Design a protein with these regions (language model features):
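A generic structural signal for short beta-strands and their flanking turns/coil linkers
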Residues: 37, 52, 61, 79-83, ...
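General beta-strand recognition
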Residues: 62-64, 84, 166
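C-terminal edge-of-domain segments
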Residues: 1-12, 123-226
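A generic structural motif
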Residues: 63-68, 156-157
Length: 226
């Protein structure tokens, strides 16, 4: 797989409902992954379907997902496990001329494949990548993770070669109806000012303001106003 090759459409990844909304440009996949914060990971555990939320980061051609060694998914993944990671972002409410045609603007990516645990030095780098993705600059401001903390954390690595991306943007379909307002209401995730813990004796972390600005930029980038 290359980072510029289009996403292949297979029986597994093909969109059937509103199929014209499917995107095969790999840059669209990366846009969704960089804009989201949580992956909802679906898998089968003890014969039952499960979905859990996981923090993640992108590293090269893989999705790195953060979890606890006590979780059932970790036990299943020791030799690799098939799963689906879904990242969804709601970008707005679409007000059509009737409720049936009213909908959401959204970006959604589903990544499917065999996930394997990350170990050794690669695990350390993966944890750092997820930290830098969620809290840029924080890694260098705090004490390094202990061996016990590392042992209690597991990272799954999922290839990005099997993915389905679906994006809807803009106004409702159909012609306007006289006397009925139609259009859409944009939505973004906003990162607010930090709230210090009671009793701390420290200046505000140097990484905070740049991190907040960066996360807000990612949230608004699709609007074309950042």
């Amino acid at each position: 797989m290359t980072t510029t090759s289009p996403l292949p459409i297979t029986d597994e990844t093909k969109v059937h409902r509103y199929k014209w909304l499917q995107r095969t440009d790999r840059s669209d996949l990366m846009e969704v992954l960089h804009a989201g914060l949580i992956a909802h990971v679906g898998f089968v555990h003890n014969g039952r379907p499960m979905v859990i939320p996981m923090a993640y980061a992108v590293s090269g051609d893989h999705l790195l997902m953060h979890g606890s060694t006590g979780a059932g998914l970790n036990r299943d993944a020791k030799v690799g496990t098939d799963l689906v990671a879904t990242i969804s972002i709601c970008d707005g409410l679409v007000y059509a001329q009737n409720l049936f045609d009213s909908t959401l603007n959204y970006r959604c990516a589903m990544v499917m494949g065999n996930a394997i645990p990350v170990k050794g030095d690669e695990k350390h780098e993966a944890i750092k990548a997820i930290s830098e993705r969620l809290m840029p600059g924080r890694w260098d401001e705090v004490v390094p993770p202990t061996a016990r903390q590392m042992a209690a954390t597991f990272i799954l690595k999922l290839p990005l070669d099997r993915a389905s991306v679906k994006i809807r943007a803009g106004a409702p379909d159909g012609e306007p109806v006289p006397g009925i307002w139609t259009g859409y209401v944009p939505m973004v995730t906003t990162v607010l000012d930090p709230v210090p813990q009671d009793g701390i004796e420290a200046e505000e972390a140097a990484s905070l303001r740049p991190a907040i600005a960066h996360l807000n930029h990612l949230s608004r980038k699709h609007l074309g106003t950042e």
